[in-house]
Amino acid sequence: MNLVDVIIPTYRPDNKFLVSIKRLLAQTVAPGKIIIINTDKAVWDRTGIEEKLKELFEESDTKLILEHIEKQDFDHGATRNFGVSKSKAEYFVCMTQDAVCFDKKTIEYLLRGMDKSIKMTYARQVPDKNANKIEKFTREFNYPAESMIKSFNERQTLGIKTYFASNVCAAYERETFDALGRFDTGQILNEDMLFAYKLIENGYFVKYEAWAKVIHSHNYTGVTQFKRNFDIGASQASNPHIFKNIKSESEGKKMVFKTMEHLLATHSYISAIRLIYISACKYAGFLAGKNYKKLPKGVVRAFSMNREFWR
């Protein structure tokens, strides 16, 4: 039995994805399998990426498992559960196609963070060299250099961040994952955070493992930020048992103020003006998402980053 496998959902992967695979194959703790669940085979075939992908595995002991699903069948939780079903490893790591291991020890550090109580670890996200100033500081704010173990006792001090975790790069112990019912399905996003909630509510711990690093960032436009935060708001509105008594707005305000302070201190005045615009887009999207049930279906689809979800 393999110690660890890696599951990656893909949609129109590019050359950056090939770089991610190269880094995974070079890990000190090599995955037994890399399981790719791709959406839209027709697009995949047109890119010719499969031939390049198979070449990377020719000299590796890691096995490539490739499955295709239709676009209408994609579901953040169910698709990853499908990937996990192809694994028999003791642990598995979920990644996104645009996350690249920072060094050869990303998986090693994720697994080193596990113990009898810690059943999920997630990696630090460091910005790409092309990330703008706002995105760089945001990553540093959300993914600091110090590791942290989170449990039920931290709810009063950490608030919403108690349950924060990211499948951009996260490791899970399979036995506990199965015992707690796997990822929730039918969710627009936040399958990682919802599972972290289940762990913590059942007495387990989640660890932010700062030594495990992946390169991952986005220079989103204001419109894209609106759409993404609409989906976040909709996710929270759909899970009141988690989010009703824990507010996330205060953490968002704290991040905006800290970012503004940093931009002004570094004389990045144009970025400071842009931060106001981006933050307004985020908050407007979040509020709209929290109230999605009051909006017409056509408006919801227009506001959402994941239009297929609302079909």
Q: Where are each of the predicted segments found?
A:
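Short beta-strand/loop segment that forms part of the nucleotide-sugar
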Residues: 32-42, 67-69
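Non-catalytic, C-terminal membrane-associated alpha-helical segments of glycosyltransferases
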Residues: 231-234, 238, 245-311
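Short, well-formed alpha-helical segments that are part of the catalytic scaffolds
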Residues: 13-26
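Glycine-rich, basic loop-to-helix element that forms the pyrophosphate-binding segment
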Residues: 70-87
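Conserved donor NDP-sugar-binding/catalytic core segment of glycosyltransferases
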Residues: 104-136
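Acidic donor-binding loop at a coil-to-helix junction in glycosyltransferase catalytic cores
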Residues: 189-195
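Short, flexible, basic/aromatic active-site loop/helix in glycosyltransferases
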Residues: 141-162
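Short aromatic/hydrophobic "clamp" motif used to bind/position activated sugar donors
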Residues: 92
